[in-house]
């Protein structure tokens, strides 16, 4: 078991402990060079020889958790590390949720957002589901299909408004305020389910309480993908819903009615703030090192001696 997973096993089994950890891991200042990351990994691997826990060791753990893949031990591409998820994706989320004058611009923002999310989901997947941890041609085609489908479906409210110009005000309100919420949540979950589908099809590695690999399980793979899909749907669904609700209240305020141009920038600020606050919350909903009871696994695992639960890397 990778040192990162061992750390999560000892420190991330409650929601509050995970939330505290993610709040530190998501610090953009942790975006450091590969040499510094490798130095941090060497330090934590020799932690037993370090006299006590000091700030240097603590920072090394945060750097490892935020920059090194827990299955391969390889350094994650800088664009897909957790600490840059907010700076990169926040503008894309705002662009995907605001009203556009044309269909092309709406589809452009949807395409860029879902392309980045697909890359992030793939880079932070459980990499034990594929041989030599490499991306298969089938998976590449699935990712392309997921991005294409999400681009069109995400722009559906704008397509309806543009193509059906003579529609009631109620329909316009539904398309602009209500429809984007389930679409954002559903497409975020859909992206995870498709991009990481091979984990459920091929299975992922299981570990016992001592960190020893005991086999590969499709049931654990399905559970890992399902939990991450719920996490991502919570993130994007809340980000779409809460600012809409807040803006509906603010639009009644006199100062906003006197200055209608404030609505757009205030709405964008609400979206960014909500998204930023929800990232550590959504990442913390489920443990990075998940547990699954042997009775819920394949028969080959139910006869294993020892603990009643086994562990798996959930991915992000």
From Swiss-Prot:
GO biological process, one term: cellular respiration
Protein species of origin: Danio rerio (Zebrafish)
Family: Belongs to the sideroflexin family.
Protein name: Sideroflexin-4
PANTHER family named in the record: SIDEROFLEXIN, SIDEROFLEXIN-4
Stored Pfam families: SFXNs
Record keywords, A-Z: Amino-acid transport, Membrane, Mitochondrion, Mitochondrion inner membrane, Transmembrane, Transmembrane helix, Transport
Entry's localization field: Mitochondrion inner membrane
């Amino acid at each position: 078991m990778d040192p990162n997973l061992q750390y999560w096993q000892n420190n991330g089994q409650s929601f509050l402990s995970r939330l505290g950890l993610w709040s530190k891991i998501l610090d953009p200042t942790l975006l450091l060079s590969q040499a510094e990351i490798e130095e941090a990994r060497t330090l934590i691997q020799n932690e037993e020889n370090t006299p006590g826990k000091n700030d240097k060791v603590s920072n090394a753990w945060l750097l490892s958790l935020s920059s090194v893949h827990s299955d391969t031990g390889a350094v994650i591409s800088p664009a897909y590390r957790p600490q840059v998820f907010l700076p990169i994706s926040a503008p894309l989320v705002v662009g995907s949720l605001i009203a556009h004058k044309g269909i092309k611009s709406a589809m452009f923002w949807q395409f860029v957002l879902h392309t980045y999310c697909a890359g992030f989901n793939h880079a932070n997947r459980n990499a034990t589901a594929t041989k030599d941890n490499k991306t298969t041609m089938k998976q590449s085609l699935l990712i392309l299909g997921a991005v294409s489908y999400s681009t069109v479906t995400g722009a559906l409210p704008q397509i309806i408004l543009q193509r059906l110009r003579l529609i009631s005000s109620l329909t316009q309100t539904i398309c602009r305020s209500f429809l984007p919420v389930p679409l954002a949540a559903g497409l975020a979950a859909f992206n995870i389910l498709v991009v990481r589908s091979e984990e459920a099809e091929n299975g992922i590695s299981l570990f016992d309480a001592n960190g020893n690999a005991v086999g590969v399980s499709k049931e654990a793979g399905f559970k890992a993908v399902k939990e991450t899909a719920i996490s991502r749907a919570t993130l994007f669904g809340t980000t779409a819903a809460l600012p809409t609700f807040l803006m509906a209240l603010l639009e009644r305020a006199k100062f906003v009615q006197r200055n209608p141009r404030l609505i757009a920038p205030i709405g964008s600020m609400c979206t960014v703030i909500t998204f930023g606050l929800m990232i550590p919350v959504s990442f913390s909903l489920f443990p990075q090192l998940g547990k699954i009871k042997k009775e819920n696994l394949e028969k080959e695992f139910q006869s294993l001696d020892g603990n009643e639960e086994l562990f798996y890397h959930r991915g992000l």
